[in-house]
């Protein structure tokens, strides 16, 4: 596996990452996939999905394998589970418990990367940076609950900001 330094974080991440979106089967299946990723040298996992089954499977797999410290985990802020479905939101009354749930299900007190989830409009980026959502992100960073801050987007204009 080849590794690269991720931006200005100093983190060495594998060129191939583990997107855990499809880990909604059994815990045994998730453990097998996670172990295969580890054996291949993959060391970064992205957990954008708020579904409790996926989060629990991934967190329990890392705990079972004793490998939390070997992984760089991207946890998303703004990805929530409401009424049995995914909802993207900036409402802190929903964002905070969703992020706390992520930490709990991963059996950890920190995320290596706190990803501001799915920002595809420049106007939305500006609102986030000027509002309470950004304040919450800064608070998490200051307390060490997230080690580095990132942003997920599908828009090159937002990525360049």
Task: Please report, for each region that a protein language model flagged, where it lies by residue.
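Glycine/proline-rich, positively charged
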Residues: 39, 87-161
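Generic anion/oxyanion-binding catalytic loop in active/binding sites
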Residues: 19, 47, 84, 100-103
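Active-site beta-loop-alpha junctions enriched in small/polar residues
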Residues: 21, 48-50, 76-80, 116-119, ...
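N-terminal binding-site loop/beta-alpha segment at the start of enzyme catalytic domains
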Residues: 1-75, 136, 142
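A generic "cationic amphipathic patch" detector
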Residues: 29-31, 58, 71, 86, ...
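Active-site mouth loops of central-metabolism enzymes
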Residues: 16-29, 77-96, 122-126
């Amino acid at each position: 596996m080849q590794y690269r330094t991720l931006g200005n974080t100093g983190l060495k991440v594998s060129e191939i990452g583990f997107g855990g979106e499809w880990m909604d089967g059994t815990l045994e299946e998730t453990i097998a996939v996670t172990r295969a990723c580890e054996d291949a040298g993959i060391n970064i996992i992205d957990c954008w999905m708020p579904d409790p089954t996926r989060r629990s499977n991934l967190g329990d797999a890392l705990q079972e394998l004793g490998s939390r410290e070997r992984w760089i985990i991207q946890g998303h802020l703004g990805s929530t589970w409401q009424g049995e479905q995914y909802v993207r939101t900036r409402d802190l009354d929903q964002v905070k418990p969703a992020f706390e749930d992520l930490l709990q299900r991963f059996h950890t007190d920190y995320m290596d990367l706190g990803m501001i989830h799915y920002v595809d409009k420049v106007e939305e980026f500006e609102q986030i940076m000027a509002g309470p959502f950004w304040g919450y992100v800064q608070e998490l960073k200051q307390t060490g609950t997230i080690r580095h801050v990132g942003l997920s987007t599908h828009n090159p204009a937002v990525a360049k900001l």
